[in-house]
Regions:
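Terminal-region recognition feature
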Residues: 1-175
Length: 175
């Protein structure tokens, strides 16, 4: 215990912590300002101080792009993941397992159908939070599936790809 606490006893003690949502405040990576969550929502995740564009999650992007209640996700086929049995400090299979658990999806791609201002479209979104937005063979296959769905339904395809490059763990197969 600190010597100051021995001399001056605290007068107010709280027994329980208040539960606060984690998205109330967010720090701007551009200028370091603390930004209020509702203000960020209004400004489409652009910092009012420096103009920095903050990252959108897949869920936030869907919410901003599509008419409410129109999104229907199309399940993607499961592909063999570790073609090369790649291993550095961790095996690729372990890295994938962690990413899948953290993001709740099999790979960094989301494909589905929705509407923008009443107009139907096929949407293909890459998830930057899944292994830093790296492309894999599953990402390539998902993109092809999105194009096929768009063609079959005779509707536009919108591809949103905040990517960082190919996954080295899959080599040339990641394209």
């Amino acid at each position: 215990m600190s010597w100051l606490k021995n001399i001056i006893r605290p007068k107010i003690a709280t027994k329980t912590k208040r539960d606060m949502p984690s998205n109330i405040w967010e720090k701007c990576p551009g200028c370091g300002d603390m930004l209020y969550g509702k203000d960020l929502e209004i400004s489409a995740r652009v910092c009012n101080g420096c103009g920095h564009h903050l990252k959108f999650s897949v869920e936030q992007r869907l919410e901003h792009l599509l008419d409410e209640g129109t999104w229907s996700e199309v399940e993607q086929p499961h592909l063999k993941a570790d073609h090369l049995k790649f291993k550095d400090r961790k095996s690729y299979s372990d890295r994938l397992r962690v990413a899948r658990r953290d993001r709740g999806r099999r790979d960094g791609i989301v494909v589905g159908n929705g509407k923008i201002e009443g107009y139907p479209l096929t949407l293909c979104l890459m998830d930057f939070d899944f292994m830093a937005g790296s492309t894999s063979s599953a990402t390539g296959k998902g993109t092809l599936n999105a194009a096929a769905i768009s063609y079959e339904k005779k509707q536009p395809l919108l591809l949103v790809a905040p990517l960082s490059g190919a996954r080295m763990q899959e080599g040339i197969l990641s394209h």
